[in-house]
């Protein structure tokens, strides 16, 4: 568990935070440049020193301004991966990985190297590596120090799109197989969507929202970040069944289900899906003989006018689903809070 209750002033920028983060999964730190994202993880890592408050990791006090406690970075058991890999140029990859490696990680070396796909790189110098390869080595080096917490400061920011696509699957694999909590700084919605379990939104050094990804994603705090044509719902689902005759998989959403193209995931596996509001249409009665496979019973929570369109907030199985319709459709269907209807979903994408 990471307890953050401190304030810090750097120049004209002030960061104030009072949150407790669980000791598992990935928490994305999100916001514009200057919002306080890097300042936050620098304070946690010990690179900067808050003037007030405390930082406590798993019961160990890292900072306590009142008591004059401020552990040095090497005593915090916190790994840090920077935007640039910062590898030692005169050491081969193997030497970079073993630098600072904890004794407890010696037996984990081969497993971690395989997990990150860097076996072929062990005898190469950093100068011969691509940007994505360097970042994989940097992540491996940080993990081999046996940290209780891993900080990643926009690790994909300096990479071009092909290299980002190369590294993203390795980060996803780490989230599944390495039981170390991570704080992931980013201003990329795509990275957050594919990696984060929770999101903390910072603005001018203040926490504007903090919670599960699907909750924060659907909140008004994210509206400025989401283009109107990309308003969407993020939903947690589980694999229910695989169709015996067609290449389709059913996902459980409350007591209803969604059909998607066949997945290789086992039954009961937890997944996260994204549904664009523009891919959801509404009808008052269940349609007959339709090509749309996913028709869910839903209740209208509210509706909002938005630049000539209407955003309809629906409840399906205790979760929020958004639909975008025209004012004409709203009036003809008499959309109002409490109305029960059917949501036809044309497309579903798997995000994690």
From Swiss-Prot:
Subunit and partners: The complex is composed of two ATP-binding proteins (ModC), two transmembrane proteins (ModB) and a solute-binding protein (ModA).
InterPro entries for this protein: AAA+_ATPase, ABC_transporter-like_ATP-bd, ABC_transporter-like_CS, Mo/tungstate-bd_C_term_dom, ModC_ABC_ATP-bd, Molybdenum_import_ModC, Mop_domain, P-loop_NTPase
Signal peptide: none
Domain called ABC transporter: residue spans: 1-229
Subcellular location per the Swiss-Prot or TrEMBL entry: Cell inner membrane
Membership in a protein family: Belongs to the ABC transporter superfamily. Molybdate importer (TC 3.A.1.8) family.
Protein role: Part of the ABC transporter complex ModABC involved in molybdenum import. Responsible for energy coupling to the transport system.
Membrane protein topology class: Peripheral membrane protein
Species whose genome carries this gene: Escherichia coli O6:H1 (strain CFT073 / ATCC 700928 / UPEC)
Mop domain residues: 289-352
EC code(s) of this entry: 7.3.2.5
Positions that bind ATP: 31-38
Superkingdom as given in the UniProt entry: Bacteria
Main location: membrane
Keywords assigned by UniProt, alphabetized: ATP-binding, Cell inner membrane, Cell membrane, Membrane, Molybdenum, Nucleotide-binding, Translocase, Transport
Protein name: Molybdenum import ATP-binding protein ModC
């Amino acid at each position: 568990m990471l307890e953050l209750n401190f304030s810090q002033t750097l120049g004209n920028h002030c960061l104030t935070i009072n949150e407790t983060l669980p000791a598992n999964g990935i928490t994305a730190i999100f916001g514009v440049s200057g919002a306080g994202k890097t300042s936050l993880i620098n304070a946690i890592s010990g690179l900067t020193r808050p003037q007030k408050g405390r930082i406590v990791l798993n019961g160990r006090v890292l900072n306590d301004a009142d008591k004059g406690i401020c552990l040095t970075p090497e005593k915090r058991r916190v790994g840090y991966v920077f935007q640039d890999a910062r590898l030692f140029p005169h050491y081969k990859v193997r030497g970079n990985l073993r630098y600072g490696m904890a004794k407890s990680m010696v037996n984990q070396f081969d497993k971690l190297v395989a997990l990150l796909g860097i076996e072929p790189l062990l005898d190469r110098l950093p100068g011969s590596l691509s940007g994505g390869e360097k970042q994989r080595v940097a992540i491996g080096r940080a993990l081999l120090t046996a940290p209780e917490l891993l900080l990643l400061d926009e690790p994909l920011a300096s990479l071009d799109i092909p290299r980002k696509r190369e590294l993203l699957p390795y980060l996803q694999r780490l989230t599944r197989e390495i039981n170390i909590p991570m704080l992931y700084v980013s201003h990329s919605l795509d990275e957050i969507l594919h990696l984060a379990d929770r999101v903390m939104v910072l603005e001018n050094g203040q926490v504007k929202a903090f919670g599960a990804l699907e909750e924060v994603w659907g909140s008004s705090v994210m509206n400025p970040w989401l283009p109107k044509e990309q308003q969407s719902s993020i939903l947690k689902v589980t694999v229910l069944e695989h169709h015996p005759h067609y290449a389709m998989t059913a996902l459980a959403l409350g007591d209803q289900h969604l059909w998607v193209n066949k997945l290789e995931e086992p039954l009961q596996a937890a997944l996260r899906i994204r549904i664009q509001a523009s891919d959801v249409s509404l009808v008052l009665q269940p349609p007959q003989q339709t090509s749309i496979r996913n028709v869910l019973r839903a209740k209208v929570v509210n509706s909002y006018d938005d630049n000539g369109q209407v955003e309809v907030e629906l409840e399906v199985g205790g979760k929020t689903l958004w639909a975008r319709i025209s004012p004409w459709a709203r009036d003809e269907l008499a959309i109002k809070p409490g109305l029960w209807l059917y949501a036809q979903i044309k497309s579903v994408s798997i995000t994690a």
